[in-house]
Amino acid sequence: MQFETILLEKRNGVGLITLNRPKALNALNSELIGEINLALDDLEKDQEIGCMVLAGSEKAFAAGADIKEMAELTFPGIYLDDFFNLADRIAQRRKPLIAAVSGYGLGGGCELALMCDFIYCADNAKFGLPELTLGVIPGIGGTQRLTLAVGKAKAMEMCLTARQMEAVEAEQCGLVARIFSKEQLLEQTMQAAEKIASKSLTASMMIKESINRAFEVNLAEGLRFERRAFHSVFATLDQKEGMQAFIEKRQAHFKNQ
């Protein structure tokens, strides 16, 4: 499969998608969002892939949306076409998806990272939602996912003042899971992804669904969902293999069955 705006690589059970619009600092346009989804479609269908990674360059994960593409849009056009509906599909993926953010993760780039299940970032990372300076608001989940990640006060401040959040603060407030040097970021992210991919994909997907459910329902309903998922894994061969391997003190070999 050939792409114009991304690179796709598969290794050790991990699918790596690298944004590749260097002259535009990986600014998100319709073509890029479309190709990300095509790559994710391919990775989700590939039974050898157990985890996916979304990365950019050292200078920029993605510095925002492509303003030249958006400047001439009209309300009837974007409303009737459901503009950004393709972006929503990124957050709806079932396999685990990790963002590796180095440099700028601004505007749509910040929102793209927030669509992933968790974020690893480099020590030079900068996150922000500066849409208000353009006379608009975040449009692919920024007001919602950022608030869930860092709380109302910081989300309000970042969106209303366009302040950029650096790596250390991002980790402290829960926006990112871990920080690495920019030289080590991709290697460390791939190691984590390979570790996830080596486990039962069925169980990984159920964990992802269960944690996401915590943001959608009350505690009682979330607990019921988790309990049903827990019961369900006992219908899999991976559960039998995992527990038998533990008893026998050996490495488990999961087959996603």
Model-based region annotation:
Residues G34, K45-E48, G56-Q92, G105, ...:
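Glycine- (often His-adjacent) and acidic-residue-rich active-site loop
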Residues I17, R21, I36, L54, ...:
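Terminal peptide-recognition signature
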Residues M1-S57, D88:
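Conserved CoA-thioester-binding segment of acyl-CoA-metabolizing enzymes
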Residues E31-E35, D82, R89, Q188, ...:
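Charged catalytic carboxylate motif
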Residues M1-F3, Q244-Q257:
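Terminal low-complexity tails and localization/encapsulation signals of metabolic enzymes
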Residues A91-T202, S232-T236, E241-Q244, R250:
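Crotonase-fold acyl-CoA enzyme core
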